[in-house]
Regions:
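Membrane-interface amphipathic segments in extracytoplasmic regions
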Residues: 1-202
């Protein structure tokens, strides 16, 4: 997400609480000429012509640092990260909420991670997604970050850094129970090893 008025960028890593940051930034910097695109988009920034608003800048919701600096190399960038286990729990709640998964967590987690390992990012889905971008799944958080200033969701420091008021949106219910086993934790730790190491999670 790019805020041209403030010359800043926010890297929204999926399932880290970034939607709340986006809303807070949109509340502070109201600009009708830019819009975060929730649908899959190839480029980080695309300009389209609309009947009602004229030119509109569509910004890719989950663009990485490296994608965004191509358009705004001098901006200051921020990113929010989350503990890998909590992030996976959020992925599960999101997919259940979207009715793309109905499998119990302890079976689903293996399908998901082994799907990532073997290049099948949709292996964790029970239904085919329609206009829901799930291509981000296999990516580790560090693949998004680049030179952005890192804040942890657990520390809640990003609000002050961006000078925005804390809000919480898109809080998903726990419809199906989430039960971890030692084996499933180990599997996630192995797959997201670089996130644990570089983001100092244990």
């Amino acid at each position: 997400m790019l805020i041209h008025e403030a010359e800043l960028g926010f890297i929204h890593i999926p399932r880290t609480g970034g939607t709340s940051i986006e809303y807070a930034l949109q509340n502070k910097y109201k600009n009708d000429s830019c819009q975060v695109n929730h649908q899959p988009q190839d480029k980080a920034v695309q300009t389209i012509q609309t009947v009602t608003h004229g030119k509109l800048e569509l910004q890719k919701k989950h663009a990485s640092y490296h994608e965004l600096i191509e358009f705004c190399p001098t901006y200051k960038y921020y990113v929010l990260v989350r503990h890998p286990l909590k992030r996976i729990e959020s992925v599960y709640r999101f997919l259940v909420h979207m009715k793309l998964v109905n499998t119990e967590f302890d079976k689903w987690i293996y399908r998901l991670i082994y799907g990532y390992i073997y290049g099948e990012p949709n292996a964790g889905l029970d239904e085919t997604p329609y206009l829901t971008d799930v291509s981000y799944g296999p990516r580790r958080q560090v693949e998004y970050i680049g030179e952005a200033e890192v804040h942890k969701l657990e520390d809640q420091t990003i609000w002050e850094a961006l000078k925005i008021s804390p809000i919480k949106v898109f809080n998903l219910p726990n419809v199906l129970p989430i039960i971890w086993t030692k084996r499933s934790i180990k599997l996630v730790e192995k797959y997201y090893e670089v996130d644990y190491e570089k983001l100092n999670y244990d």
